Amino acid sequence: MEKKKFVFIITHSYDRPDLAAGAMQLASNMVAFDMELDFFLMDDGVLLAKEGFAETLTWQKKDEFSPVHELMKTLIDDFGVKFYICSSCVKHYELDKVKLVKNAEIKPGSFLAEMLRDRQALTF
């Protein structure tokens, strides 16, 4: 049986940390069940790719989801999940001047369109 493939489109970070955490919690559960997935970060979500940024998200609701930085570490280190960054957002969020997290790559919107040809999308 062919693996199901997904792309998680994340558009929030500091503005809605619980939304980002919920997406990553779901993704962690899905990869544990052998589903293939990666993330495409857009708008405020691109900040998650900035090294050290996820650790600053300390105002999540208590006892709801694991902290964003812990979820990202698990997804990257244990499951090899990639975090693609929308190239149109790079200059606006000054990501061209900082170090990115492991498994982060800058890609154009057309790359997301290509991914959507054979993947289901979940947007947060």
Can you say where each PLM-predicted feature lies in the sequence?
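A short aromatic-anchored loop/beta-hairpin motif
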Residues: 82-87, 93-101, 105-106, 110-113
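Histidine-anchored nucleotide/phosphate-binding helix
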Residues: 20-33, 39
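A glycine-rich helix N-cap at a beta->alpha junction
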Residues: 56-87
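N-terminal beta-loop-helix "entrance" segment that forms/cooperates
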Residues: 45-58
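Short, glycine-rich nucleotide/cofactor-binding loops
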Residues: 8-21
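Short hydrophobic/aromatic patches at helix-to-coil boundaries
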Residues: 120-124
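Extreme N-terminal starter segment of soluble prokaryotic enzymes
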Residues: 2-7
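Short internal beta-strands
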Residues: 37-43, 83-87
